[in-house]
């Protein structure tokens, strides 16, 4: 489901934004492209150090939006491209998803995003 260009973006460092819906409106957190791991072609695993509000939001509403990009990957209109990922999320503290981010010793959990759609934005 995720296109090859998405994987090219992951090879270059950049900021990732993850949006959830909270009781008081949207909530955003950030991480890095290099922290993301893709499993089975449609699950993105993110190591979690904090993200307590994100976790509470996901417990109420599993829908998430994620954006990421890189200036170093050619886009449709020139240098730089990005993606908008829509998906459902869950937090895992054990199992294969958590093991996938074991190199991050500070991670208390894994945020697992099952991709519903991936749209190239640039």
Curated annotation (Swiss-Prot):
<keyword id="KW-0963">Cytoplasm</keyword>
<keyword id="KW-0249">Electron transport</keyword>
<comment type="subunit">
    <text>Monomer and homodimer.</text>
</comment>
<dbReference type="InterPro" id="IPR012349">
    <property type="entry name" value="Split_barrel_FMN-bd"/>
</dbReference>
<dbReference type="Pfam" id="PF01243">
    <property type="entry name" value="PNPOx_N"/>
</dbReference>
<keyword id="KW-0285">Flavoprotein</keyword>
<keyword id="KW-0288">FMN</keyword>
<keyword id="KW-0813">Transport</keyword>
<comment type="function">
    <text>Functions as a redox protein with a potential of -325 mV.</text>
</comment>
<dbReference type="InterPro" id="IPR011576">
    <property type="entry name" value="Pyridox_Oxase_N"/>
</dbReference>
<protein>
    <recommendedName>
        <fullName>FMN-binding protein</fullName>
    </recommendedName>
</protein>
<dbReference type="GO" id="GO:0005737">
    <property type="term" value="C:cytoplasm"/>
</dbReference>
